[in-house]
């Protein structure tokens, strides 16, 4: 067909964050009208977070997981370590978290742009981190950085899918991970932050 797919790939990669879509045969314009009328929410975390707290009992350390779009793998790993887990909604307050007297707090992964998460979440992180160790995964990590004055920026090319190599610098060991991320902490702002 004489289409240079390598050149197309390079153009898409170099252009930054591309628009995504699929080309399919459509018998009429009604499908396009529906697409134009679709409004995507910026409040993705509110859509996927648990509406009510729930326990994931264990006999070990007490851990609160703040659900920004929690994946079962996180709970599974905490259970393997016998942690006594309480999962709270994304909009839990610092007082609600601290009242549980946790040994640690996990800020879970989740969807979307961290800048759209309500500022009350950043305030909760600031208050809780003064009294309890925090661990952020994905979106939780980005929110932790924002709460402490670092900047979070879009990746030039998002990372989605499996088999992304990650090199552990100290041991020179390479592991492969599934990734789904569109943002990263701007490391040039970390030195000026509270991190």
Where are the language model's segments positioned?
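RNA-binding accessory domains that recognize and position tRNA/RNA substrates
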Residues: 1-95, 99-100, 112
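Short, flexible helix/strand-to-coil boundary loops that buttress conserved ligand/catalytic motifs
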Residues: 12, 148, 189
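Active-site environment of divalent metal-dependent phosphoester hydrolases
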Residues: 72, 184-187
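Short histidine-centered beta-strand/loop micro-motifs
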Residues: 76, 177, 189
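Cysteine-nucleophile active-site neighborhood
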Residues: 104-179, 184
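Short, intrinsically disordered, charge-balanced linker/junction segments flanking boundaries
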Residues: 190-195
């Amino acid at each position: 067909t004489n289409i240079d797919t390598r050149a197309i790939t390079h153009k898409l990669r170099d252009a930054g964050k591309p628009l995504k879509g699929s080309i399919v045969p459509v018998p009429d314009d009604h499908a396009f009208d529906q697409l134009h009328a679709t409004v995507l929410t910026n409040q993705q975390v509110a859509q996927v977070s648990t509406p009510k707290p729930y326990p994931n009992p264990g006999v070990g350390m007490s851990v609160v997981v703040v659900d920004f779009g929690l994946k079962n793998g996180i709970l599974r790993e905490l259970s393997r370590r016998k942690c006594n887990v309480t999962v709270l909604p994304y909009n839990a307050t610092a007082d609600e978290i601290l009242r549980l007297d946790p040994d640690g707090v996990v800020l879970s992964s989740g969807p979307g742009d961290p800048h759209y998460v309500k500022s009350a979440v950043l305030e909760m992180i600031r208050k809780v981190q003064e009294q309890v160790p925090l661990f952020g995964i994905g979106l939780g990590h980005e929110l932790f950085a924002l709460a402490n004055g670092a900047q979070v920026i879009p990746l030039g090319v998002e990372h989605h899918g499996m088999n992304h190599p990650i090199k552990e610098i100290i041991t020179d060991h390479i592991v492969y991970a599934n990734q789904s991320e569109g943002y990263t902490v701007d490391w040039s702002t970390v030195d000026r932050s509270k991190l």
